[in-house]
Amino acid sequence: GAMEEISAVCSLQFDDRGDDNDDGVEIWYYNLDKRQSEGSYGFAYTPGSDSDEGLVAINWSTYQNADGSFKNSIASGSFYGITFMQELSHASGLKHPHDKGLLDQPRFPGLTHRSNEFRDKGDFDQNAHPFTQLSYVDKGARNGMVPESIEAYGFLQTPGALDIAALQWMYGINPDAASGDDTYTLPLENREGTGWRAIWDTGGVDRITAAGA
């Protein structure tokens, strides 16, 4: 899940203590009616932003029908699967690239307060998926790398390369991740759960294979 993917690239670890007293991160699920929930995927409070810092709230009614069935796939790699990773990343201290930080940290290079958060990709066109899962330039990023519409595949399964750099700057690296000889196999088709992965690998003799493609 999202916790494991974040912990795999940096020294931040998530432990279930069995209670909610002074937790660093809390995850809530809530439901809104159709009118209220339109466009609301979830939200989170970054450290230092609010007395509820570390809270992750997911609007379950965006993803699930009244009978419990899912409206769209929430599999890792799907468009809706991004929400869980993105909100947990906010609770861990990451911001949107188009926003300034609480301590006036700058926006992504090439973006200003006049930038369109859903369209402008900044320097080198990297304020977009799959370089960062915190960008609002997601579906239809016009870079040929992600689907043009909501799909069950084609989006990030892990923090993007820029997200990994930020997490490691804040928390330090995970020095033990993928330390052996690893093989990374490229998927052969676009189907539910197929998505982008940014590799953080700390050792061994590794290879990327497209065998069977």
Label each residue range with its predicted role.
Residues 1-213:
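RTX-like calcium-binding, glycine/aspartate-rich low-complexity repeat tracts
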